[in-house]
Every structure is written in structure tokens, then in C-alpha cells.
Amino acid sequence: MSDSHLTAFDKASKAGFIIALGIVYGDIGTSPLYTIQSLVENQGGVNQVSESFILGSISLIIWTLTLITTIKYVLIALKADNHHEGGIFSLFTLVRKMSPWLIIPAMIGGATLLSDGALTPAVTVTSAIEGLKAVPGLSHIYQNQTNVIITTLVILIVLFGIQRFGTGFIGKIFGPVMFIWFSFLGVSGFFNTLGHLEIFKAINPYYALHLLFSPENHRGIFILGSIFLATTGAEALYSDLGHVGRGNIYVSWPFVKMCIVLSYCGQAAWILANKHSGIELNPFFASVPSQLRVYLVSLATLAAIIASQALISGSFTLVSEAMRLKIFPLFRVTYPGANLGQLYIPVINWILFAVTSCTVLAFRTSAHMEAAYGLAITITMLMTTILLKYYLIKKGTRPILAHLVMAFFALVEFIFFLASAIKFMHGGYAVVILALAIVFVMFIWHAGTRIVFKYVKSLNLNDYKEQIKQLRDDVCFDLYQTNVVYLSNRMQDHMIDRSILYSILDKRPKRAQVYWFVNVQVTDEPYTAKYKVDMMGTDYMVRVNLYLGFRMPQTVPRYLRTIVQDLMESGRLPKQEQEYTITPGRDVGDFRFVLIEERVSNARQLSNFERFIMQTKASIKHVTASPMRWFGLQYSEVTLEVVPLILSDVLKLPIKELVPVEDSEA
């Protein structure tokens, strides 16, 4: 990493500050919509809230934001960047060589982050639309919760529907809108506190600890389940590191934290002033003058949409990284925007839409959704803490210090997990079931890949160079293709899958001028695009290792075109002049890609568990993108060949020949 790149990454700018507001803080910035409301409703309503309860609640929120968001994520996790990229899978790639079992927290953390992301749009948009209940002239319409649900679903349909076209055209307004949003949170919160400046006593952590053990707190430690709603966006903050740079987050987070803390304090001050008024509206909207509420609802809806968009885009990125790390099935990925960071995965988009819509229909109110929200993200944070401990050790932190620091955060997050566990019975089970389903799919995919590596046999290409040369020169066989390309997941030195050589020499000898053996390796660096070539001392056999970052598309033909030109220009590969062509001077022949698919056969030596893994993986493959589409081969000539998983060590089934018995009287 050059000093100039490091400086640019750590450097802050005015434009970067605004961009960070629009990309990074959508989730955590919309938490004031529902956090205080959740606390009040679980306490029994505004009239049941005492001053000590309010002071303790605000103190818990302030210190939760300080410990988890500021110290763990902003000050520690942001330093764990993988070539400027953040997030749990980027962190995993930094430490995966330290222990093979680290794949487990990475998969669990990724799955729970995905499942939590499916709930966020439902909670934020519903909370914003429910604000219309406090708007004079519209309240009589939106007192009917069905109208809230219909409006929310319309917004979600539009939001998920435009994903296929890319969101760059509206992304430019995200930053300015969120700047207005945070400014409003800060200003309105500050003015609400002017009549109750005692609310700032909540900065003292005494009030937080006192509330946890106070009889006035009807929920005891389980109140932390509502408190945690204030910091659910901390993980997203780390995941979006690569989009805005560390420096811009360092500069923007103090502003964001100040604004949301003022909002929480302002809502608390309004509750103290109106606890006997009988008003049972969301304190966030009720604390604003009635003539401004319609504008606030509009602004809150925009902020909720921006937060939802960030979660949707983050889900696409998360799944894309998991696919390239070979722990998730391959789904079709498109790039509707001008840059690689704007990607779209249709299957994931519509699964998220289905889950989000079902959440709105099943839970109906934001209060019911809040009762289920946050459980999964506590697990994600615990998994991130585990990986961070290994990262600190890798970077030279004394092991005892790394253990102590991360043990502290693990303890805090485990307490939040226990406090949120009660949400399981109030709808949290839906998020847990979704997370378990994602973990199951990841486990099957990862385990299936390991089984294939275990059983597939390899042969040395050098031992077959002469046979392949003879086949190339044998005019008794028709030319199969000028260039035949085999894609192999397993290629080390000159060792290659036996099934590939079987395809060339045995299955139907494939005569070609050049045989290409291509292996795609995903690197820990996100945007690597490099290759290494070995001609094996010939001009007809080419081994290509493609080294692509885990955020790069694996469109092999595009890379191969460049490699062919490089080899011909350097004289390592003869030009393939074409007699018949519409392109004058064309000196590259035609290509055919051969894909070999391994399938489980009933006569193979797999254990029952391994057979279950492979059969389940095969079933999942039916709904995933084909390798042809994944490697960008849909416009190329492709042959798909099916081979049994184990090409050797075939079990010999006992069978005897029936010998005719001669008639003794003959």
C-alpha cells in the first residue's frame, strides 16, 4: 500500500463528509424513530415513565453508543481494513489463515447480518409512515393501521423495483438529505431540552447502572433489548468503510453522534414535560410542533428509504463476497451502475422484498417489529468481536491485551444478546430461522466444496504432454476447436483434475491447436486483477492462474482476451490467422469452453453424511446461477460434461457369469 493511497484513504474532505452521511449512517441515524418509543411502550406508556427511568434510559443509550459504536467500531474495527474494505467477510479474509475454524464465526456473522438486513426496511419505513398519525388533517386516515401498511408496501415495492436499474441516479441526493436529517435531529432535540436541561445529567453512567437494578424498571435487564436498537447500525458503519474511507468516518461520526444524542435527549425532555398529558403518540413526532410534522414525516420517510437502500446494497455486497469466498451458492450478478461497487443480485433482491413485505404484513405495527428487531445483529457483533481478537494478535498486539479488550466487548454484547433473547418469543424467531437457513446453505456449500477437494483425483500434465501433442497433430480427428478452455477449481503446479484429461483424451478425443487450463483464485485483496501463465515448454498447452479480488467479477472471457493478446505480442503463442473472417487482420481463432460438473453416483465410496451434503448441494444448484453465467460465458461456445464425483476407486459390484449347463444326455 503506497503512502499516497494511505493518505487518501485516511483523509477527510467536505464532499466525503456529505457522502458518508448518505451511505454509512442510514441505519443508526433512523434509530431515533423507534428507540424511545420502544422503551416507553414496554414501560406501559408515557404516564408510567418517571424522571429516573428517563435519565437511566438516555444514559444507557449514550454509553451504548460510546462503548460499542465509538470505541469498538470507530476506534478499533475501522483499523481492520482489508485494502480499504471493511465488513465481516473482509475481516475474515485478513485472519482466515490463523485458524481453519474462523470460517464458522464468519458464516454465522454474515448470515445474521443478512437476516437483520431483511427486517430493517420494514421497521424504518413503517415507523416513518406511522408519523402521519400525528399530522393534523391526515391523522384520521392513518389511525387505521391498514392504511399505514398499504403505504409502506407501496414504498417497498418501488424501492426494491428500482434496484435492477441501479440507484446511482438518486444516490447523489442521499448525502444532502441525511445532512438535513441529522441537522434537524440535533436542532429539534436541542430546543426540546431547553426546558429540562437536567436531562443532560444522563451523561453520568451512574444513572444507567441505577436503572438496570431499579424497581421502577419493569423489565429489568431485558430493557437492554430496546436500548440496543440505538446501535444496530454500528456493524453497517464498518461494512461501508470502503465506500467513504476511514478519515471521513472519523470526521462525520462526532457530528452524527451529537445529533442523535440530542434527538434522544429532546424526546426524553418532551416526555418529562408531557407525561400527564395522556398523549400516546410516538415521542419522536409528538415532540415537534404540529405544523411541522408533515414535513418531518416526509423527511423521515426519505431517511428511512436511504437507510433501507444502504441495507439492500450492503446485502448485495455481502452475498457477492460470500460467493467469491466459495461459502455461498452462485447467483446471477449484474452491474447496473458505472462502477463495480453498484451491483444487483435479482434472487437476493426479491427474497429480501418477500421477507420484508411478509414482516410488515405479519407484525403490522412498528412496535411489534421492534419487539423482534436487533436479536440477530447482537450475534453478528459477537462474531465480529471474535475475528477482531485474532486480527489484533496478527497485527502485533500482545495476546493477553487482545484477549482482555475483546473479552470486555464480548461480555457487553453477550449481555445485550441475553437481553434481546426474550425477543425470540415476540417474533425474533422469524429472524433466527432465516439466519439458520442462511447458515445451513453456507455450511452445505462450503462442506460440499471440501468433499470434492477430498475425493477428486489429480494427474500431472507433464505426463500427458506427448499424448496431447500427438492428438493436436492427428488429422484423423476433426478439429474440435482452435482453442479449448478448461476451467478448473483445483490446479496446483502441474497437477490437474483427472476428469479434465479424461475429457480431452478418452471421452471423445478433442483435437485443438491450443489447450488452455484456467484456474480462478480469489485473493484477500478486494480489487486484484492479475494473472500468471505457464506455457509448460510448449506452444499448445497454457496454464493460466487468474488472481481476482473477492469483489471482482469473474468474467473469464474478458480476461482471457487480454491474456491471449499479451502472449501473442510477446511471441510465446503463435498467431492463429483466420482465412475466413469479417475482421481484417484477425489473428485469434475461435474458443470453446468446457465445463465439467461432478455429480454423486450411488456406487461411490462416500459416507452417508458426505452423500447428504453433496445431494443437498446438488439440489441447491437447481436454483442458482449456472457456472456458464457466473464466469460470463453466456455469449461463448460452451460444452457441459457430467462426470461422477469419484473417477477412480470405483466399487466393484460382485457379479457372476451364468455358464450354460450341458445336457448330460446330449
Curated annotation (Swiss-Prot):
What's the family? Belongs to the HAK/KUP transporter (TC 2.A.72) family.
| UniProt keyword annotations, A-Z | Cell membrane, Ion transport, Membrane, Potassium, Potassium transport, Symport, Transmembrane, Transmembrane helix, Transport
Identify the main location: membrane
Q: Which PANTHER family match?
A: K+ POTASSIUM TRANSPORTER, OSMOTIC STRESS POTASSIUM TRANSPORTER
Disulfide connectivity for this sequence is none
Q: What does this protein do?
A: Transport of potassium into the cell. Likely operates as a K(+):H(+) symporter.
> What GO annotations for molecular function exist for this entry?
potassium ion transmembrane transporter activity; symporter activity
According to its UniProt record, what is one Pfam family this protein matches? K_trans_C
Transmembrane helix among keywords? yes
Q: How does it sit in the membrane?
A: Multi-pass membrane protein
Starting at the broadest rank, the lineage of the source organism is: Bacteria, Bacillati, Bacillota, Bacilli, Lactobacillales
Q: Where in the cell is it found?
A: Cell membrane
| Substrates-to-products reaction catalysed | K(+)(in) + H(+)(in) = K(+)(out) + H(+)(out)
Q: What is this protein called?
A: Probable potassium transport system protein Kup
Cellular component, GO annotation: plasma membrane
Against InterPro entries, the record matches this protein to: K+_transporter, K_trans_C, K_trans_N, Kup
**What residues form the membrane-spanning segments?**
16-36, 58-78, 100-120, 141-161, 165-185, 221-241, 253-273, 294-314, 343-363, 373-393, 399-419, 424-444
